Amino acid sequence: ASSDTAKKNSGGKMALQQIFYGAPGTGKSYEVNSITKKNRYATIRTTFHPDSDYSTFVGAYKPTMANAPVYGAQGVEIAKEKRITYTFVKQAFLKAYLGAWQKLANGVDSVEPQFLVIEEINRGNCAQIFGDLFQLLDRSGNGFSTYPIEADADLQNEIAKEFGQGGEYMLANEFNVDYAVPDYISNYGKTLTEDIKLGRILLLPNNLYIWATMNTSDQSLF
C-alpha cells in the first residue's frame, strides 16, 4: 500500500494524517494495524459506508432504556421502572478526541499517541460525515489544529462532562495548552485551555493521529 501524507507531526517521525491507498488485498489495513499494534498505540477504528453521517462519526442523542423514579401522590419516590430516556452516545471521532486530550493532559514524562483509523474512507460522503470538522484537519507546525471551531450545544455539554470532575476522560487540573494557538482570541473572554476543557471549542491535539485506508478499485466513490 502506498500513502498520501497530509501533514507531518512535529516530531517528524509519523504523519499526523495520512491515507493508505491501493487495490484490494495490497495490505493497507495490515500496514496500519501492524504499526499501531507493534507500538501498542491506543486505537479507535471505524468504517465509512454510504449511510455514514456526522452523528454516526461524532455522536448524538439516542433513546435508551434506563431506571427512572416513579413518584407517588405526595411527590415521594415509591419505585423505579424502565423508561425510555435520551443519552448522548459517543462515536469514534469523539472517543478518539477525548482520549487524545486526556493523554496529553495527564502525560508526565511523555505523551502517548491516540489513533483514529478510518477504513474505506472513500465509501462515505466525507463532506456529510465531517461537516465543519474538516477545518480541524489543517494542522500548524506544532501539530495542533490551526483553526479551532465552535462546538454545538450537545457536543459542548458532553465534552465538558467528560473532561470535568468525575468524568471518564477527566483532565488534570494543572493542564495548560494556551501555547497551542498563540494568537487565539476567545469568544467567551477565557483562555484557550478553559474553552477546550468546557467543550466550547474543538481543537485537535498534536497526539491525535487520523489515518485512513482507501480502496482505489471501489466504484462507490464520493
PLM region spans:
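AAA+ P-loop NTPase catalytic core and its hallmark functional loops
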Residues: 1-222
